[in-house]
């Protein structure tokens, strides 16, 4: 890892080509702490892409599947995913039983379970924002490992973080979505993550862009 920083950098790698994904992951691995992949890459390439990225980078890989189903289905998705990945992201709005089903799998496999409270896009203010504090309370009660809260609205990030005190935060929205890194760093603390995706992987030189963000942290 390049230098020392209290706040960690998570690369959101939402490309759909296997070779490109592995190359970018490997090139940026010196400057990132964790790599987050989602449905675009896994649906295009299969679950084995997780193992390939881990092997190429020696970094943890978190699957951002935002799992949101009934408990029995959530359990199956978590089982399949966590046979490969180091962690999985689920939605909180489906309720405590559905989240607990994933938590049980995570605990059995010693893997991270991260729950969405409020997303970073404008549409999240229409519905999710109204129940984000309640979901943060649920995250605190269930003792999830981490929560998702938005970099695009630092005041919301701060409020949600103050509720789920024991969970680490992963915060999307810096870069292409317009979130300000300095504002976010004023809120986040040790063991929290800033998530940056397109600003790095769409750049002509992803390695240099990852380094640039790391040096600002």
UniProtKB/Swiss-Prot annotation:
Belongs to the OMP decarboxylase family. Type 1 subfamily. It comes from Methanococcus maripaludis (strain C6 / ATCC BAA-1332). It catalyses: orotidine 5'-phosphate + H(+) = UMP + CO2. Substrate binds at residues 14, 36, 64-73, 120, 172-182, 197-198. GO terms for cellular component: cytosol. InterPro entries: Aldolase_TIM, OMPdecase, OMPdecase_arc, OMPdecase_AS, OMPdeCOase_dom, RibuloseP-bd_barrel. This is Orotidine 5'-phosphate decarboxylase. The keyword Lyase applies. GO terms for biological process: 'de novo' pyrimidine nucleobase biosynthetic process; 'de novo' UMP biosynthetic process. Homodimer. It comes from the Archaea.
